[in-house]
Amino acid sequence: KYSKKYNYKYAILRYFNVAGPLQDYNRTIPPVFAGFILRIKGNHNPIVFGDYMKARDYIDVSDVNAFHILCMENEDTANQTFNLGTGKMTNLMDLKNMIAEIMDVKVDFDHYDAIAGEALNSYGDISKAKSMGWEPKKDITDTIKETIVYLENEIKEGNIDPFTFMEDLEIEKIGA
């Protein structure tokens, strides 16, 4: 109603799991890419809550940015809702294995109870976004590599210590 009354154009964008450099790794539960990478850098196993076969649709932040620009430049996106993801799921086991292979290490998981209410699988139907001429371009392995480089620089600059990363995590308050 507001958009019609004031001739205001909008686009609603539903992000799935945005990944890549500059993620806020200081959150209570850090983004999975940063969490896994920093735990490995600190000689710890990545932490997983619940089923390590749960899967998510990970999209690179640069692909999300590209769709933002498309929305600003293309009138056909006005007053519509779009899912932004890749349309592909990657489970935590595969993600851990990809990261470990790129980092040339062998790691297991530190496993904790599931987080209450967390979905087992989540991915987006991106067909509507694709109908606007947009396609996600970044492969998950490229996103992992760029995130590793970013986090290595954060470590080098003294912004984070991978050996103490997540040591204050209160597991019992997170799990079910």
Regions found by a protein language model. Give the residues of each.
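Active-site Tyr-X1-5-Lys
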Residues: 1-11, 16, 37-42
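Conserved sequence/active-site signature of Rossmann-fold short-chain dehydrogenase/reductase
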Residues: 11, 18-20, 64
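Active-site loop/turn elements of alpha/beta-hydrolase fold enzymes
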Residues: 15-18, 51
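Short beta-loop-alpha junction of Rossmann-like oxidoreductase domains
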Residues: 21-23, 128
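Active-site "substrate specificity/gating" loop of NAD(P)-dependent dehydrogenases
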Residues: 24, 28, 51
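C-terminal substrate-binding subdomain of Rossmann-fold SDR/epimerase-dehydratase oxidoreductases
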Residues: 41-176
